[in-house]
Amino acid sequence: MKLAYTQNALGTLSHLPLPIRKAFYKQAVFLVANLHHPSLHAKKYSESEDRWQARVNRGWRFYFKIVGDTYIVTEIIPHPR
């Protein structure tokens, strides 16, 4: 699988604090290797939009779509509690 980013996700990623950015990159490696990696806690977030959610850390989540053999990261946001 490959990883791609929307402009929105890239903009957010460039402004994240370094520890959050590093945690995201670590999780992105896990995502590319195995969607079901335990630390991702990946789940289908919206069936109608075919949108998935995964964990960056306890306070941050990222959202992505699966298109062919590519994961497209659409958003990286604080966890909506």
Question: Which residues does each PLM region occupy?
Answer:
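A short, surface-exposed loop/turn module that caps and links secondary-structure elements
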Residues: 30-54
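Solvent-exposed, charged interface segments at domain starts and junctions
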Residues: 1-2, 38
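Enriched for short, Lys/Arg-rich terminal
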Residues: 2-11, 15-22, 55-81
